Regions:
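Helix-to-loop junction immediately C-terminal to a conserved catalytic motif
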Residues: 42
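Catalytic Walker B motif of ABC-type/P-loop ATPase nucleotide-binding domains
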Residues: 133-136
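ABC ATPase nucleotide-binding domains
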Residues: 200, 208-239
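Conserved ABC ATPase signature
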Residues: 108-112, 116
C-alpha cells in the first residue's frame, strides 16, 4: 500500500497485517506516516496504490490523538459517551468499567484529569465491542507512570475482549514492552518483529539510538497467547 497527500508520498510499499488478539505497536519519528497508516486502516484515507483489506463486518474502535472540548459547554461523561446516539447507563458503566474508570459516569468532562480523559475516550471506543482497537498517541500528555498504567489497561482490555490492538506512540520503552509485535515506520516499514528484535535492529537504532532496550524491561509484556486469523491487511499491489 502507498499513500500520497497533496502530491507528496507519505507511505510507500507498506505490507502489514494484524491478527486476532495481537497487540501491534507502530513507532517512528514525526512525519513518518504513523497516524496516516491508522487513518487508512479505518478508511479515512484512500491508498494511491494497493489495498486495505478488512475482515467482513469488522468492528473497529478508535481512540484519537487529540479531542478538544469547549470548556464552557457542560457535558457529563454519560452524555459524551452517548454522542452521536444515546446509550443506556448500563452500557456506559460497562464500557467505563472495562476502561478502568467505573465511577466517572456523572463527572463533567472538563473536570477530568488527563489520565481520566484518556480512559473515557477508551471507553467510548469500546462501546461497540470492537474486534480491532486503534489508538493514536493515546497517552499524549500523560506522565510515564500514567502511560504505563494506561498500556497495562490496554493489555487487560485485550484479554477481556480478545480484540486486536494497534497503537501509535512515542512512549517507546513503555509501549514496545506492552506489544507482541512492533513496526518501525519512516515512510516505509524499516524493520518489524518482537520488541527486542526491533530494539536491536540497526534501522531502529539509527532513528532512536540504543537507550530503549534497558528501560523496556521495567514494563515487560508476557507473551502467553497465540494469534490467529488476520483481521486487517494492508497490501501493496505494485511491483
Amino acid at each position: 500500500m502507498s499513500i500520497r497527500v497533496d502530491g507528496r508520498t507519505i507511505l510507500e510499499h507498506v505490507n502489514a497485517s494484524v491478527s486476532e488478539g495481537e497487540i501491534v505497536t507502530i513507532v517512528g519519528p514525526n512525519g513518518s506516516g504513523k497516524s496516516t497508516l491508522l487513518r487508512a486502516m479505518i478508511g479515512a484515507v484512500s491508498p494511491a496504490q494497493g489495498t486495505v483489506q478488512r475482515a467482513s463486518g469488522l468492528r473497529i474502535g478508535y481512540v484519537p490523538q487529540k479531542l478538544a472540548l469547549d470548556a464552557a459547554l457542560p457535558m457529563t461523561v454519560q452524555r459524551f459517551l452517548g454522542l452521536p446516539k444515546r446509550i443506556s447507563a448500563r452500557d456506559a458503566i460497562n464500557a467505563l468499567d472495562i476502561a478502568g474508570v467505573p465511577d466517572l459516569r456523572s463527572r463533567q468532562m472538563t473536570k477530568l484529569s488527563g489520565g481520566q480523559f484518556q480512559r473515557v475516550l477508551l471507553a467510548r471506543a469500546l462501546l461497540e465491542n470492537p474486534q480491532l482497537l486503534l489508538l493514536d498517541e493515546a497517552t499524549q500528555g500523560l506522565d510515564q507512570p500514567g502511560a504505563a498504567a494506561f498500556y497495562q489497561r490496554i493489555e487487560q482490555v485485550r484479554r477481556d475482549l480478545g480484540c486486536a490492538v494497534v497503537m501509535v506512540s512515542h512512549d517507546l520503552h513503555v509501549v514496545m514492552a506492552a506489544s507482541d509485535r512492533v513496526l518501525c515506520l519512516n515512510g516505509h516499514i524499516c524493520c518489524e518483529g518482537s520488541p527486542n528484535t526491533v530494539a536491536d535492529a540497526p534501522e531502529y537504532r539509527a532513528l532512536f539510538g540504543s537507550g530503549t532496550k534497558g528501560t523496556m524491561a521495567l514494563y515487560q509484556h508476557k507473551h502467553s497467547h497465540s494469534h490467529h486469523h488476520d483481521h486487517h491487511h494492508a497490501q501493496d499491489n505494485t511491483n
